[in-house]
Structure formats: C-alpha cells, structure tokens
C-alpha cells in the first residue's frame, strides 16, 4: 500500500558546547569537541541527519525542551535535525562561538496557519562574550533571516518569531557550539495518485 511523504509532528529544542585540547586533522574541533557538544545537548547516541528549514503546520505549539523527550530516545536511532553548529580553533583567533535557531510561522490571506520555516545562525568572536551578547546577536541575525524567508514567499507572519541560542567561550585549543531542533514523531501525507 503506498503512503505519502513523511512530516514531523513533534520537535524538541536543545543545545550543547564542547571543547578540548586534543583533536584529529583535518578539522580537530569536529571530533572531541563535537561529541562533547552532542553529549551536553543529550543527543549523543543518535545518528544525526540534517534537514533544511521548512516546518509543517503540525509542529506549531509542539516544540518542547529536550528534557521532556529524553525518556523516548532510542540508542542508535536516526534523529533528523535542523542544526546550527560550528567549531573553531583559538589559534585562528576565535575565542567564542554563538549559535542559534529561529522559527517563523506564516499565514495565508485568510489568516490560517500554513506552516513555518527555520533559520540557523553561527557567529565567531575574537574575544569572550556573555549570554546577553550571544542572545542579542542571535535574535538580530535570525530576525533578519526569518523575515527574508517570509518576504521571499510573499507570506505574512502568523505569530511571534521563536529563538533558541547557545554559546561557548573557548578556554582550550578547540571549541564547538550547537543549537538544534530534533524531530521525533511523524505522520504521512496522502499518497500521490497520478492519472
């Protein structure tokens, strides 16, 4: 029996950071630091598959903190995510990394929710920062990106933008920061029938 395309109906937001004095070439921050960031984000035992940025309307109101979902995690399962994550080396002059994910929801001409879009943000800083700087920069750049996604599609904003952010001040050689949405539950659209 055929079935249509799959779409998520439950998501969680999470974030993590990692740092290390050790790493393996060619991108040393992609090994130990990335694993530590996944561990802090509580998604270290998933096989991570990245998405682009389109959200079905069924996710509206169904994005929760990661701690509400942990009991449903399955070791070794595939986790589809929208993730803003990058690493850096202090030897390159980066001493802090901020990451964020923003969400906008759009409506049709009748005011009905049609779905949403996400945007990712990563910024490198030459000095240490604090949470206020990380949050304000994330909101500034994500707001611009989310509005662009709506304008590009000639879609009107349905509700307030949502923002999630994270940051690291790198104290060791390498650091990594990530902010992510993970998708857990799914349904299927009606199958296509071509006559």
From Swiss-Prot:
Transmembrane segments: none annotated. Its EC number is 4.1.1.19. GO terms for molecular function: arginine decarboxylase activity. The record marks 52-53 as: Cleavage (non-hydrolytic). It is found in: Cytoplasm. PANTHER family: PYRUVOYL-DEPENDENT ARGININE DECARBOXYLASE. Coiled coil: none annotated. This is Pyruvoyl-dependent arginine decarboxylase AaxB. It catalyses: L-arginine + H(+) = agmatine + CO2. It comes from Chlamydia caviae (strain ATCC VR-813 / DSM 19441 / 03DC25 / GPIC). Trimer of an alpha-beta dimer. Keywords: Cytoplasm, Decarboxylase, Lyase, Pyruvate, Virulence. It holds the Pfam family PvlArgDC.
